[in-house]
Regions:
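Structural/interface elements that position substrates and couple domains in central-metabolism enzymes
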Residues: 2-88, 94-144
Length: 144
């Protein structure tokens, strides 16, 4: 039986997209990479009034992205998170699982081209909504 936390219907995606206000972006890129989805998707979210919290994997010297303080781990981000938007290769998502589970966001979104069913199952079992292999910017434009 499919988990109710594995969001796969258009209705479930629409409902999630409409309620996000605060998003941590795991694997965000810097302004120097403005042509890459890991920068321009969070830039779009920021431009429509969603609070974007940068959690880059690289760029140890960077202190801010999109004018927001950078955090190195999900658990270090203060306050609740509506969503963690993940820009990591499918095979690399699992190395962030414990950090994401410890933070307990309401939902996790694996961007277009990113799918890891083992991670999605663990998140769903913890009561965290999961979307895989979809672009948050495309779905936000469509439904919000």
């Amino acid at each position: 039986m499919a988990s109710p936390h594995r969001l796969e219907t258009e209705e479930a995606i629409r409902d999630l997209v409409k309620r996000i206000r605060r998003v941590a972006v795991l694997g965000i890129k810097t302004e120097e990479h403005s042509d890459q989805p890991a920068f321009y998707v969070p830039e779009y979210l920021h431009s429509v009034g969603i609070e974007v919290i940068p959690v880059p994997v690289y760029y140890p010297e960077v202190k801010e992205i999109l004018g927001q303080k950078v955090y190195r781990k999900m658990v270090d981000v203060p306050g609740e998170l509506d969503l963690v938007d993940v820009f990591r290769k499918s095979k690399d998502v699992e190395q962030h699982l414990d950090d994401i589970l410890a933070k307990k966001p309401k939902a996790v979104w694996l961007q277009a081209g990113i799918r890891n069913d083992a991670v999605a199952d663990r998140l769903a079992a913890a009561g965290i909504d999961v979307v895989q292999d979809r672009c948050l910017m495309v779905d936000h434009r469509r439904y919000a």
